[in-house]
Amino acid sequence: MGSFSTITASFLLFLACQLLWQTGANPVYGSVSNADLMDFKNLLDHLEDKMPLEDEVVPPQVLSEQNEEAGAALSPLPEVPPWAGEVNPAQRDGGALGRGSWDSSDRSALLKSKLRALLAAPRSLRRSSCFGGRMDRIGAQSGLGCNSFRYRR
C-alpha cells in the first residue's frame, strides 16, 4: 500500500505544479483562485501526513525481536532425526514406495489402457491450427495460418 500512496502523492503534486504553471496557457483553466490552491495544498499536506515514511530506519533490536517471535512460532515443528545413509533392501527394490508388487506386464497393460483412453478422448484430437477451424481454412488459403505449408513448384 506504500507504493500506491507514493504514486498518489506524486500525482497530486504533479497536478499542483501543472495548475501553477498553466496560468497563461489556457484561459479557461487559468483562473484558479487562491482559495482553491490553498485547499489543494492542505489536502496534499494531509495526505503526506497520513503516508508513512518508507525510509524509516528500524532499530536492530526490533528486528531481532521479530526474528525471535518468528522462530518461536516455528519451534512446535517435530524434530527430524538425521539420515544415517543406509537403505533397506525393501527400499532398494521399490517396495517401500508401493511399486515393488507390480509386475511389468500389469504396469504395461495399465499404461497402454491409459494411452488408448487419452488418444480416444475428444479433446486430444489433433488440431491443425491455433485459432480454430474457420481461421485455419482462411490461413491455408492465404498462407498466413499457424500450420499452413505452401509447396513450392
UniProtKB/Swiss-Prot annotation:
GO terms for biological process, alphabetical: cGMP biosynthetic process; female pregnancy; receptor guanylyl cyclase signaling pathway; regulation of blood pressure; vasodilation
Propeptide span(s): 26-123, 93-103
Name of the protein in its database record: Natriuretic peptides A
Region (Important for degradation of atrial natriuretic peptide by IDE): 147-151
Keyword annotations from UniProtKB, A to Z: Cell projection, Disulfide bond, Hormone, Phosphoprotein, Secreted, Signal, Vasoactive, Vasodilator
Domain of life: Eukaryota
Signal peptide: 1-25
One example GO MF annotation: hormone activity
PTM (free text): The precursor molecule is proteolytically cleaved by CORIN at Arg-123 to produce the atrial natriuretic peptide. Undergoes further proteolytic cleavage by unknown proteases to give rise to long-acting natriuretic peptide, vessel dilator and kaliuretic peptide. Additional processing gives rise to the auriculin and atriopeptin peptides. In the kidneys, alternative processing by an unknown protease results in the peptide urodilatin.
InterPro entries, sorted: Natr_peptide, Natr_peptide_CS, Natriuretic_peptide, Natriuretic_peptide_atrial
Chain's gene name: NPPA
Residues found modified as Phosphoserine: S129
S-S pairs: C130-C146
Site-annotated residues for Cleavage: R123, S124, C130, F131
Any one Gene Ontology cellular component term annotated for this protein: perikaryon
Residues annotated as transmembrane: none
Region annotated Disordered, chain positions: 62-104
Family: Belongs to the natriuretic peptide family.
